[in-house]
Amino acid sequence: MTAIRDANRAKIDGNDRLGKAVSAALQDAGVQMARWMRPGGSGVHVHTGGSWVKVFWWYATEKEQRTAPVPWIEENNGGVRVEVAAALLHAGFRFTDDGADFALTYDNNRHV
């Protein structure tokens, strides 16, 4: 039982490190990051939970969600998603793209 718990803890800790490393890489690349509950705070959010790290566009307020443009998938060269993918690749991260979000796992990114 202890071995299972230790393995789960190691995965959780690895995903936490991965989420922080992904956030840092995106910030270093100049990607517009989300700022919680602030007008004009919409941006890319890195969510760490369970066995995945997810990267997606997050609107800071409901008003922005209804009225702001959708830079995540803009027609002009793919929008912010293209920036995020390039930054992740440049930083050496392996990820999957489900068409909406990017997903990363510690198992595929043990270098963090």
Label the model's feature ranges:
Residues 48, 57-59, 71-81:
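A signal for specific C-terminal beta-sheet/loop modules enriched in small/flexible residues
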Residues 75-112:
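Short, compact, well-ordered microdomains
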Residues 1-8:
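N-terminal, Lys/Arg- and Ser/Thr-rich interaction peptides
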Residues 17-18, 83:
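Generic hydrophobic/packing signal
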